[in-house]
Amino acid sequence: AADSERYYDPLDYRPISITQQPDGNWTATSQDYVHLVIVGFNRMGRSLLLEALRICHYANYDDRLPTDERIRTHITLVDREMESQKDYFKAQFPYIESQIGDIEVEYCHDDICSTAMRTRLQQWAQNKHCMLTVAICVHDPDLSLSLGLNLPHEVYQHQCRVLIRQDFNNDLSSIVDDEQGRYRYVKVFGMVDRGMKKNILQDKLALYVNYLYDCCYTDESLKQKEVLKKMYE
């Protein structure tokens, strides 16, 4: 990527497909699912969680299936101070998880370097249906790099995505971004000197998709359709 921009793979970095049956219903043909592991439930970690809860809704979730057979997005939060961090988050957003049925959130009071967590990372990385992304969000930039570059080798071997928080872009960050070997899918993020552009924050594309869906499948009021139609045009 150019110096002025960085490109990141989406969390669903393999296509999630569905097919239309003769009766008109849609059925999932992909068993793949997104699994986001957030290390460090600080302000950055909470922001990533909230954004993931907003966007990680995929077409192969089918609420017609029995509850235990539905394909859900998984989010695992790991922090050594999770109990206190979790209480703070739940006080801010007491109802957020109960309103989302297609995402499972797990809070782990643990260290990402513990034997138990490393074993779980290995298992997730080796699962052929799991699209694993590990986001290292700890404050200390040196510790963040160390954690992100020393995950179980299965994470890199199976081309899982790794995001490492860095406050500023430096030579080592650039080397990691340009790596084409073991760390090919490791990227740094969060640099304060590389702020988000205004157009990234726009939700027009989502509105367009919603407009087309409503026109095809729902009896939404004409007034709202006309408003969205003007935006689409």
Q: For each of these PLM feature ranges, what is it?
A:
Residues 1-233:
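Cytosolic regulatory regions of ion transport systems
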